[in-house]
Amino acid sequence: QEVFSVKEDQYKKEGCSFRVAATGQKLFTAGVHTASGDVGRGVMANIDDAYAASNPNALALAWDSAHSNVHNLIGEDLKAKPSSAGNGSFDNFLVYWDGDLGRELLDANIIQKYFASTGTTKRFYGPSDGYTLTGASPNNYTKRTPSLVADIWGDWREEIIMPVNKASSTEQAYLRI
């Protein structure tokens, strides 16, 4: 078993690493840490079925918020990491959305698919394409995360639960947690 982790310690001088869980042996370390000292977030997953088919022993790809490229399982830079014009990069969350074996990228209320061979993305949902998760907002401004991502219906794809911008009810609740 292996472990992928993002480092937030500016003195470790590594943005993310991939290690053997039992021994701690490094399989790769991605780059030198940024001057700001905050990598903050990162992901690793099979996000491109075509890449996985041509690299069956190394199907996962990884990236973090401090570096500009996607890395394979031995730490080689492949292409530019996924980004969304005006919305930052997709370092937060992954979701099984379109029914294939690869995960899609989720940031705030935008869902995209990444293609490792070209370093490009295809947007499924987002503010600029008319297919928005209407009225949905992420939980916080900096991390832009949903409340829950899970396969609730058991159909392989995952559902996304987010707060709505304007919530109302005909029954007022006075108790708060």
Question: What are these model-derived regions, one by one?
Answer:
Residues 12, 32-45, 83-98, 130-148:
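Repeat-based blade/solenoid architectures
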Residues 11-17, 65-74, 109-117, 168-177:
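Structural motif
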Residues 22, 47-48, 97, 151-153:
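Calcium-coordinating acidic loop motifs
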Residues 35, 43-48, 63-65, 69-96, ...:
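Exposed, low-structure sequence patches enriched in small/polar residues
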Residues 20-34, 76-86, 117-141:
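Blade-edge motifs of beta-propeller repeat domains
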Residues 1-7, 51-63, 96-109, 154-163:
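Acidic/hydrophobic-patterned starts of short beta strands in beta-sheet-rich repeat architectures
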Residues 151-177:
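Blade-level signature of beta-propeller repeat domains, shared across WD40, Kelch, NHL, RCC1
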Residues 1-77:
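Catalytic cores of extracellular degradative/oxidative enzymes
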